[in-house]
Amino acid sequence: MKTRKIFAALMLSMLASMPTMAQEKYFSPATSEAATPDAEGFIRRWTVLEPISKQNRSNTVFVDSYLRETFAHEYFKNQMTILPKDGQKVKVTFERPKPQPRPAGQPGQPGGAPMDFRRMQQGPVEMETATETLKWHKLDSKHYNFKLMRFGEHEIQRVYGVIYWVVTVINCDQDMNDVRLSVGSNSASQWWVNGEDVLLMSSDRRMVADDCTSHRLNLKKGENIIRGAIINGPGMSDFCVRLVDENGKVIKSGYTIK
């Protein structure tokens, strides 16, 4: 009997540690020291907000007009200007399916539980407004692409029907003219540099490095802010970002990441 209890305790301990072990495979906490682009020029340090629930039964809705309207909606205060700190919390407003009454004795999911895609596919679903508190995490990715799905499943067990907000600050040694932001994302996304809308990546897409590039940008000496929003319904979520020069050559030096 004692042996069984010890075995059960060990199993519970192993199961509890699995999410942390999985997280450590993909990310490490950012340090106070400035980071640099990796050997291929990818920016790996990002401050990421825990995923906001955004119910979509399919990614086919990710056309330009839908994305602009969705990303323009204010989910939290100072959405387009905030420079979040690690661990900072924000109050988020979002929509979720309104819980349906169930027959007495029939188990059901509580309000705010993960999206039921079968229910969504049956037709229009009545939505309700809800609020929750989410937290920012400053992380260094261990891969060139930041695996948002792994981040989401570890932090709040939310992986589908989501919007991720990401921010990073790069510090340029000198003015950098005629550079482009080069991005890959799964699925659709929108990107801003120093508050300017520079790139919209629409449609249901897979993450491919350098999938889209912005117009030519002039980065000033000192701090420059890169902000992104990535949306997905069903499926994996990740992204990668680097800078290229006017000839498409990857920029691997000349700036650090705060």
Segments (PLM) and residue ranges:
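Accessory carbohydrate-binding/adhesion or oligomerization-edge regions at the termini
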Residues: Q23-N145, A229-K258
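Extracellular beta-rich ligand/substrate-recognition surface
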Residues: H154-Y164, S202-M207
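Aromatic-lined ligand-binding clefts that engage carbohydrates, nucleic acids, or primary amines
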Residues: N177-W192, I226
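Bacterial N-terminal signal peptides that target proteins for export
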Residues: M1-A8
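Beta-strand-rich ligand-recognition modules
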Residues: V193-V241
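Extracellular and analogous surface-interaction loops
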Residues: V166-D178, R216-K221
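Sec/Tat signal peptide C-region and signal peptidase I cleavage site
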Residues: M18-A22
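Bacterial N-terminal signal peptides
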Residues: A8-S17
